[in-house]
């Protein structure tokens, strides 16, 4: 009775094996990739687990094929078939992953080979440059000092000496002629004479002084370089007027002191002389 009860009971006794196989599979999928050999070992372990599970299923099916087996439910067999199918699918996917890893490893190896070939150690050495020594500078041969005999011979031969002397004489004469002409031209040119315009104030003694006679006395002064100009009578005050007269003088010949001395000589009419304005021309 106890055996028949266990046969009809839906208990999966080998579930821990499938759990272990599934755990190892996901550990291999999520863990670090150590190489193609490690992946192949994991795949072989899964395959062995699947084969062992198949054997156990077959044994369990053979055990339930005895008397009373037909009365057992068919749901267990369908679940086992579905589970086996899923494991086969996972097996195929795992094989694809292993193949992709192998291809990636082969590509990495090819890349490493290319990098090793292109490294400086494998490069061809550059051709050595030849050392060229600098060229020695060739010094020109030193000239031998001329002997006194050769100097005498050179002095004796003068093909154009006479012509040079004649040209020097002509150039000297031409230079003297031009200097003489320049001196004559400069002598004929009138020299600039410095002149000044002076405005004088001649004051009488009083209002009874004859201003016409005073002006005549002033204009009677004749000096070399003196030219008298316009004049006028300017009232001073109290009926007294002063004579304001303009003159142009050459600075080298006539000075203001000389003019004052000459005008003040007329003591009867002139009291004083002042310079009202002085301008250079």
From Swiss-Prot:
Using the UniProt annotation, give all residue ranges assigned to the region (Catalytic (GEF)).
173-281
What are the N6-succinyllysine sites (modified residues) in this protein?
117
Matching PROSITE patterns, A to Z?
EF1BD_1, EF1BD_2
**What segment(s) does the record annotate as region Leucine-zipper?**
80-115
**What does the entry list under GO cellular component?**
cytosol; eukaryotic translation elongation factor 1 complex; nucleus
Q: Which residues carry this modification: Phosphothreonine?
A: 129, 147
What GO molecular function annotations does the UniProt record carry, in alphabetical order? DNA binding; guanyl-nucleotide exchange factor activity; translation elongation factor activity
Q: Which domain of life is it from?
A: Eukaryota
Q: Which SUPFAM superfamilies match?
A: eEF-1beta-like
Q: Which residues carry this modification: Phosphoserine?
A: 37, 44, 60, 86, 106, 119, 133, 162
Give the matching CDD domains. Answer: EF1B
User: So what family is this one in?
Assistant: Belongs to the EF-1-beta/EF-1-delta family.
Name of the protein in question: Elongation factor 1-delta
- Give the source species: Macaca fascicularis
Give the gene symbol.
Answer: EEF1D
